Every structure is written in structure tokens, then in C-alpha cells.
Amino acid sequence: MAIIDTTKDLSALFTQQVRASPNALALEDDKTSYTYAELDKEVEELSRRLRSYGVSRDSLVGVLLPRSAHFVIACLAALRAGGAFLVLELAYPPDLLADVLEDATPAVVVTHRSETGKIKGSVPVISLDEPPVDANGHTVEPGPLPVDDDLDRLAFVSYSSGTTGKPKGIANPHRAPVLSYNLRFGVQDLQPGDRVACNVFFIWEILRPLIRGATVVAVPDDHSYDPAALVDLLASRHITETLMTPTLLATILSRHSDIGARLPELRTLWLNGEVVTTDLARRAIRALPNTRLLNCYSACETHEIACGDIKEIVSDESQYCPVGPLLDPKHAYIVNEQGEKVEEGVSGELCVGGPMLARGYINRPETTAKAFIPDPFSNSPGAVMYRTGDRARMLPSGLLEITGRVGAMIKLRGYSVVPGKVENDIVKHLAVRQCAVVAHGEGLERQLVAYIVADQEHSEERPTVEINSSGHSPGARRALTKFLAHYMIPALWVQVDELPTHEVSGKIDLKRLPPPPTEVLANGNGKKEDPIGIEDIAAIWAVALKVPKATLKPEDNFFDLGGHSLSIADLSSRLSRKFGFRIPIVRLAENSTLSGHLDTVRAIRDGHTAAVQADLPAVLRTDATLDEEIRSDAKICSLTDAKTVLLTGVTGFLGAFLLKDLVDSTSAHIICLVRFNEPEDDDQPGGVARIRRNLLDLGLWNDSIMERVEILPGNLSRSRFGLTPDAFQELAQRVDVIVHAAASVNLVYPYAALRAANVGGTREILRLASQGGATVQYVSTNGVLPPSGEKGWPEDTMLDMKDVPTKLLDGYGQTKWVAEQLVLEAGRRGLPVRVHRIGTVSGHSQSGAANAWDLLTALIVESIKLGKYPDVEGWRAEMTPVDFVSKAIIHLANQTAVEQTVFHIGDPDPVNTRSVFEDLKTLGYPTEPLSWDDWVALWTSQRGHVKGGDGGFTVDILRSGMPSIEFLRGIVVLDNSATRPIRREVERPKVDRFLLETYTRHWFARGWLKRPPIRQRQLSPIPKGPLSGKVAVVTGASSGIGAAVATALAREGAHVALGARRLDALESLKEKLSASGVKVVTCKTDVTDRKQVEGLVKAATEELGPVDILVACAGVMYFTMMANTQMDEWERTVDVNCKGILNSLASTVPGMLARGKGHVVAISSDAGRKVFPGLGVYSASKFFVEATLQALRLETAGQGLRVTAVQPGNTATDLLGMSTDAEAIKKYGEPSGAQILDPEDVANSIIYALRQPEHVAMNEILIEPRDEPI
């Protein structure tokens, strides 16, 4: 019995419903809604406009719109005008859209203004978001409207990929959907009040609710494959019915185990597009106990063929769920290769006849004839049946079961892909002579693999396919993006000499194709070293079972060792927390050995990863949305002012240098977040050990570092780093500045594999900052931008979200892009944030300490060993020394007054690698150029088999993933024009033969090279003593003792701030000291002016860090007779010697006491111990210095301050020539003939005092000429 009037067309059925329920809600999207009457009015107005363009029976109206209310209106209007709607996907690349328009020749295209530029040629266009205009000369006298019972006329055309390179348009008459809807209403009817969300199969769903009085809710494109957004929409819009693919449902269930509670109003869920596994069916039934789950099988050419209630038809005896009973059993046949019907239970090809068939493919008579063949089982003249290409069988229960594919069409995450179309475009647009595209993997792991035979002739239009060791080809993907939809582009590529053929048929034998490549990692055995290993699983077994980990073996069974239902639930929870994705109990129970659990965890991980990658644009959009509660109104805090700093990434390369520089240049307490899978307080010793091991390897460790460091065991991949809410809140209240340098770095892994740490971790960092008002200094990367060519990207460059999947081709860059977006959004919400984009971080410019995993280093070292280097046009070496990067970040973090948010720390003009190898030749490492392909072949034959390990570490790196030539050329250059003036005090080392000498000397020391480089300059030893990295302020530094002390401090590795009145002398001294590699700051300073002294200390603190050492050398000495009353000289003596020391102490001592450490050294005199005639006022001033220092020493005892008075005797300085009292000079200032002190003698005594251990105080140093004792 018909539920609807199957004699009327779709437009008439809609009009009937308008009359029946004019005020009922018919349609809504995220912007607007329409009652049936309002919708009818919109449809009528647009249909009249369409008629003016000549739309009539079988005319096509192109619909190039997002999934929205406008899309539905356009389709209904096309039908009311008497024509048919033509679906034009927004995802079509320009060439594919042009092919469809040329093939279908629509009378007009309905679109939005933003899409009109895509439509080429003379096709008329109607923009729904612009005011109506006339037909611009296209007005055609419309013919009569077709009668409403003409069900054979065209209703809609949808395109799928074709095998010859041209897409094919499937032409469906009104009869097909009308009869299909009637059958589906027999399975599950709709009624007023029902709310149907239309998303994945949009055009197949939008009209059905509108002929039964229900409401159509148009799901936006960006929600359709975004599980989180889709569930939110289904819940907030009170959806009662929807349809989705099994893959999408599986993804939703993995994230929302309580989906039934989230969607209490969802009464019906249709599944279509893929086979439903029994496992998924069972999970769905449990998760949605109050929802009717309907498994539906259909084809674009046939509409619905079978449908069944999953709860009634699922069986544990099969891996897959049957589809259900046939909806039209009279016209569905399962046939063998001879075209004969098979018996029940026997598999064959499913063919469908009857009145619901499509007309065929427009303008494709041959293709139509192959797919729609004469129906031998029908008595109707001219009847045809459609070959679905699916293998099926009828079960004894009367249910249809799909068992596989007969033809070549590939089902991929709900998409249908015809390999021939993909193969044709690969051959046409790449330098490929022959190609075969197949599917590899199952379920969510299913992906396209292209097997290619290379064409030796290539051009700009047909570039060579470069395939990296992991089987990916970013260049091929970029080239095909213009011609194929994203889901049609192969994920993996394999180059073969020839495609295997079948011995009998001569056709390509797909079964004989080799498997796709497995990624080769650094274990050197040719197998992928999976980051999840059996040791990880065993550690959690040991906790759950309370057994020693060392006793566990791969074949052990969880239940045999005492496991039970509660302990396996605990195990599931622990594994899920550790790895960041849900691991169901049932999966663990199915294969309960230790090795079985390892396989299970890996399989679920890979499925989780594939689900994310399948719908990357939607995932990116969701992940780049910041939680609403993350906002702040805190003021920015500099590192100089911070009392507590949180540092992440400290066990990495850059993080180690950041820790060392933070300790050396700030007074802050530093909390280091160290990663542990299951963070516990007991992990703190392990955290210390990991930091120590890292810093020792890089030559940075000294035991005093830990005096200022606290270990925080945590995990960035976990909510709140794995801390309790209270611990997280307490941490937030303590931290003033967060330096977030941690990241999971892997240029091979996809987005999903790096997402938790890089995106989730940054989100948690921002959450922490918002709760306590901390400032966030975020370390980003040049990888958030695509290759830049010769000119670099300026600081304000931001890649648009829609370009991320196609222009950032590695998961690392994609995750860092999303993380950066979160940081910038937090900044817009009031959080004080800074973003530091860094380039390729190379070794230390002075020590050469290198990142052992650096790819560029590996290529250089391996080239030296081969005697050949890759000669690649456009390959530039971006090397930014790590010490520069670290100090630049810290310096920029202290520039709180600037408004700039994004800083670039990289090489704005990287050198060509050819010049690098020329410089290496001067260092004694000659190499000759070789083409990239030949170099790779040579390396593979001569070095690829070499044993790895410490001595062959660079071999391991290249074995783990040889880069492609496109990767080498695709350098991302960062223009630092806006950053450079702000960080001008931090100079970037030049990449030249001197830097390369430092690097190669280090590589030799690590055993990577067989001989040291030829020395280019006299090497200065890198100071490693107790003064290395300390910050010292020296007054009176322009000459004499002050200059000697500054020189001695720089020689010890201390950074120095020089103050004196003669700036030219200071600059000259700075040039000399800077050559030793230390930082030097100069500031014109008169110590009698308190503001100038404060300015000197402020400059030292901002440029170098908190002051560790004060050496007050400024002083004057005049020989005067008391009776001669030389008032000007007396006043000058008191001002400089007395007020000067007070100003110096006032500017430095409070900061030292706050840090609990510091050393004050002041030049007194032996005249401060005994009065010398002719130097009465001078002696008095030095007695003042001694009294002041003694008081300071006594009052601060126990507070970490050391105070040293240095009492030089007669020293060769300019002071001896300052006096004007001739009588005093004659009487008391004549030389005795003894050898007096040099300034360096005094300086050395000061260095001796400064080098003493913290508990040793040298309170006074009396240093005199041997023959002039007091």
C-alpha cells in the first residue's frame, strides 16, 4: 500500500505538503529558518527567475552552493520550474568543475557571489546572496510547465568519477526518488515535528522530509565529518533522525561512549555508504539503546535496494552485518558470470531492475550500455537492469549480505572512487607512463595506493613523481590537487619497472602488485620502529596485575595471571589514559595475551589516526577552536620580573639551552615539566636524571643548576598535564611566565599522531595561563608556513585554514599551525602571549654542540663520507645556531613594551648548500657534486647497509626517512625585518667556514667524521669555570683596574656590563671582549649620578640577565696637603669614592638579596687601612668604603651575599697623574723605585676571590708591591 501519492512528481508532493502544514517549520540551517509557506514563497520566486533563463523539462540547473537552506531552495526551485537540479560540489577543483559544466551544459547555475569566479565560460549565473537582476539578455520565453504526473522527466543529476578521465553524470527521473521515498517510509515514516539532519548524503535526504511535514536541518559542510561539531549540532537542534556512514559513526562512538545520553531525542539513525561490521553494530546498539538503527544499501543509479533494523538482523556468526531484506525483491537479482540467477546462499553479482533506476549517464551512451544491460528476468519491453558491481548473497533468513566488489570501484570512508579516473589523471598530469590505483588496508586504515611506471620524459606540466622512503609524494599530491578531489588522491606511491599482467587475460594482475612500503626508522633493520612497544604494555600490565614487570613474557595471558573483569577494566582505563585514545574492554578481552594487547592497541591507534586524517579539514577547524573559558586580563610579565617560570621541552635540544640561559639570566625559580606517561610525584628523581643526561650531552651541566630548578612530572597529551584539578590550579597561581618549547617533532607522522601533544598540550598551557594570569612565550616553527621561495615570509603572514591540508603536507607543521592559532586567539582574548617562530636550529656557535637528530647535519656528514654531495638547484642551508635562538627568545621575552606578537628567529637569507660544501672543502672535506637521484643511489649502495649506533648515527637518520628533492627545495624562509630591530643586541652568528669549522670539530669529536677540520683561526677555549655565564657590572671600566677586571671576567666566560664616562673607550673595549664570545653591554655612566648607575644596571639586567657580580672600580685619587684646602678635588673625591659606591650598592644589592646570591667587590685601597700623608681625604673616602662594606657584610650574613674589599697598593693607573697640588706631589707622590702593581695583578686577585666556592668568602684582599708594604 502506497504511503504517499506515487503518481505525482517531487514538486507536486512538496506543494501538497505546503497546503497541509503551511505554518509548520520546514527548513533551517545555521543562519535562518523557513515555515512551509515561507519556503514555498522562496521556491516560487527563484523558480520564476529560472524560467526566465529557459528552464523547462529536462533542463539542468547547476547548484554550486554549500550545504544550506539556499541549496534546498535551489533544488526545489529547479524542480518547480520544470527542470532538474545538477549537483556541483564546492570541493571540485577548477578543471573538474569545468569538465562537468561542459558535459552537462546547464541552462543556469545558482550559487553565491564568493563562488562565481569558479564558473568559466558563458554559463549564466544567479547569485542568491546578491539582489535579483534581470537575465542580462538571456531571457527566454518559458515553455509550458510539465504536468505533475510526468515521472519520467529528469529530477536531478549527480556526478561520480569516471574511468576514462571524464566524470559521469547520473541522471535520475522523478519516478526513482518518489518510489524510493515511499519504500523508506514503509520502513520508517516521518511526521510533523520530526527533525531530520541532512549531511553526508545531502541531495538524497533533503527532499524526503519535506513531503511528510517534517523539518529539514541542513548540516554545514564543516560539520558533516567533524564528530564533535556534528554531535553538538544533533544535540542542540534536537534532531530526531539522521543518516551517516559507518565510519563516521565509529569515529563518533570512539569519542562519545555516552552518545545516547547526549542525543536522547534521536529516534532513527540510517547507516549507508559502507558495510557495517558486527563490532560496530554491537557498539552502536549499546551506545544508542533508544535509537532505531537502520542499515541501508543503495546506489546512485538505483536508489534503495535493501534495508533492515540492525538490532533485529545483527549476528555474531559473521564479521559483517547483513543489510536487511530487499525492498523490491521482484527486481533484485544475484547472478553468476553467465548472467544466471544463483541459489540462495551463493555469492554473485547484484543486479537491480525495476522502476527506480536512473536513466543512465548523460552524454555517455557506451558507458550507460555497459552498466545498464537488458533485464532478462523482466517481461516489460526494453527493461534494463543495473550492474552494481557488488558481490552479494541472499541468506536463508531472507536478508541480503554484501560480500565484496566485482568491479573496480573503491569504497573509501563513504566516498566512491573509480580507480580509472584517478589513474587517467595521474598519467595525464604527472610523468607517469602507466598506473594502477588500488585500495590497501581495511576500515579506517583503508587508503589509496598508486603503483606507477615512470615516464622518462617530464615537463613542467607533467613533473616527475618524487617518492620518499615512507611512500609519500607531497609533490604529486600538490600537482593533482587541481584535478582530483582530496579523497581521490593516493596516500601512498610505489614505483615499479612494469605493472604485472595476468598470464591468460593479459590484464593488469592487481594481486601480484607488491605491498606498499613500510617506513624505515632508526633501528636500521628495515622495519618501522613503532613508538608503542611491548615494554609500554608490560609496564601497565604489571601495575594492573600487581606483578613484577620483568617476569612478563609476550605469550602470557592476562587472565591466566589473575586478571578478571574488574582488573581488565582498570587495564583499559590505564591504557586509554597513557595513549590518548579509547581502548575498549571487549577488544582487550578478545586477544588477551601480552603480545595480543600490543597488536590491539596499535590497531586501535592506527584506526584512530586514519579517522582523523580522513576528515582533516574538519578536524583542523575543530581543533583550532579555543575553549570559551580561556581568557584573561592579566598584564604581560617579563622574564626579568618573573618570580616563577614554567619551562616545557627541557629534555629536548633547544629546551636545554633555554634552561641554562634562564638560570644564568634570570632570578626566577624554574619549574621544568618533564614528560611521564603516568605522572607521579615519585617521578621527580627520574626527571632530574633525564635533564642532567641531556645537559651533560650538550656540555651545559653543572650541579648548581638544580638549586633553582623544580621538576614537575607531567604529560602534555593529558588534560591538565595529568595533574589533579587542585594541583593544576596551585601551579597556575605560582607561575608568572610560561616558556612553552615542548613539541612532538616528526616530519613523517600524520596530524593525528602528533595532535595530542602539540595541539592538546598547547591548549592546556593556555588553560593554565588563563587561570593564573601567566604570560605565555610560545615557541613555534617556520613549518606553520609553506615554502617561500627566495623572499621570506614577514612576521604578519598567516596561512588560511583552508590551505593547511594542501600547503602544509606534514603532520608536524599542521599541528604547530593549529597550536599557533590557539595562542593567537588567546591573545585576542586578553592573555599576554608572544609567538617565536624559529627556523632550523643548528649547533652551538661556540662549542658546536649539536642536535643528534638533525637531518641537515646527517646529509652533510654522509656527503663528506661519500666524497659526493647532492647538487640540488634551489637547496639552501637554513642553519640557526641554538645559542642564538635561545638568547633571542629570552631577550624578546623581556621586551614587554613592544606591541608585536609574532617574532621570527631564523636566517632571513640562507646560504646555498653549494657554498657550504665549498667552505667544507677549505676545511679539508672535499666533495664533488652529484645529482640527487644518483646521490641517493650511491648512498644506498655504499652507506645504507652500514651498522648504525653512535658512530653511524647519521646513517640511522637517513635510513629513518630519506628526504625528497622537493623537501630540500621547499625551504621556509622567515623575513625578520620587524623582529631584527627589537633583538638587535642579540647578534646572529654568520654561517661561514668559521662556524662550519666549529661544527665539524664537534662532529669529529662525536665520531661522526674521521678527521678534524683544518684550523681556520686560533681557537679560544670555551670557559667552563664557575664564572661562565655569570653577569657582572663593572664601573670605572674605561681604563686601569676596571678595564683589566672586565677583560679578566670575559676571559672567564662572564658577560659584562661596562660603565664609565668615556663611551668611546668602552666601545673599544667591547669590541675586544666580544671576540671571546661573551656578551658585552656598554653604558655611559657617571657613578655620582644615581639615575645613570640605575640605567647601567637596568641595561645589564635586560640585555644579559640578573646581576651576579658587582665590581665597583670607579674612583679618583688626588695628592693634596690638608693645609692647602683643595676643595674642588676634595669634593670630587667624596662624590666619586663615597657617593659612587653607595649608588652602585643601591642599584644591585636588593636584586642579589632577592635571588639569595651575589658577590659585591669594591676597590678600596691600602690607604683604607692606614692613613697616608698627602692622601688624607682619599684615605678618608676609602675608610668610608671599608666601613660601608663591613656593615653590608655583617647585616646580610646568611642571606647568600659575599662582600669583598680589595685594597691595592701602588698600581700603574691614570690616577697618579690626576693631582694638581705640586707641594703634595713633591713631598709624598714621588716614586720609591719599587716595582709597582699592574692593573692585571689586581684583576687576577679579584678573579681569584670570585672563583671561590659559594661557602667561601674572601672579605678583604690586601695586594701591594712586594717592596712597599704598609
Curated annotation (Swiss-Prot):
Domain of life: Eukaryota
GO molecular function: oxidoreductase activity; phosphopantetheine binding
UniProt-listed GO biological process terms: biosynthetic process
Domain (Carrier): residue spans on this chain: 528-605
Keyword terms: Multifunctional enzyme, Oxidoreductase, Phosphopantetheine, Phosphoprotein, Repeat
Ranges for region Adenylation (A) domain: 14-418
Activity regulation note: The tetramethylammonium ion, which mimics the head group of glycine betaine, acts as a competitive inhibitor of ATRR A domain, whereas the potency decreased by three orders of magnitude with dimethylammonium. Choline is a mixed inhibitor for both glycine betaine reductase and aldehyde reductase activity but more potent in competition against glycine betaine in the first reduction step. Therefore, choline could act as a feedback inhibitor to regulate ATRR enzymatic activity.
Known outcome of mutating Y812F: Abolishes overall carboxylic acid reductase activity but does nor affect aldehyde reductase activity
Region feature Aldehyde reductase domain R2, mapped onto this chain: 1026-1256
Effect of inactivating the gene: Severely impairs the hyphae growth and conidiation at high level glycine betaine. Exhibits a choline-auxotroph character, when the phosphatidylethanolamine N-methyltransferase choA is also deleted.
Keyword Phosphoprotein included in the entry's annotation: yes
Modified residues (O-(pantetheine 4'-phosphoryl)serine): S565
RNA-binding among keywords: no
Enzyme class: oxidoreductase
Record EC number: 1.2.1.-, 1.1.1.-
UniProt-annotated stretches for the region Carboxylic acid reductase domain R1: 643-937
Family: Belongs to the NRP synthetase family.
Record comment regarding domains: The NRPS-like protein ATRR has an unusual domain arcitecture (A-T-R1-R2), with the adenylation domain A activating and thioesterifying glycine betaine which is then channeled through the phosphopantetheine arm of the T domain, the thioester reductase domain R1 reducing glycine betainoyl thioester to glycine betaine aldehyde, and the aldehyde reductase domain R2 converting glycine betaine aldehyde into choline.
Purpose: NRPS-like enzyme with an unusual domain architecture that converts back glycine betaine to choline via a 2-step reduction mechanism, and thereby can be an alternative source of choline. Permits direct reutilization of endogenously stored glycine betaine for on-demand biosynthesis of choline and choline derivatives, including phospholipid phosphatidylcholine (PC) which has an essential role in maintaining membrane integrity and functionality, or choline-O-sulfate, a mean for intracellular sulfate storage.
Protein name: Glycine betaine reductase ATRR
Organism in which the protein naturally occurs: Emericella nidulans (strain FGSC A4 / ATCC 38163 / CBS 112.46 / NRRL 194 / M139) (Aspergillus nidulans)
Classification lineage: Eukaryota, Fungi, Dikarya, Ascomycota, Pezizomycotina
Gene from which the chain derives: ATRR
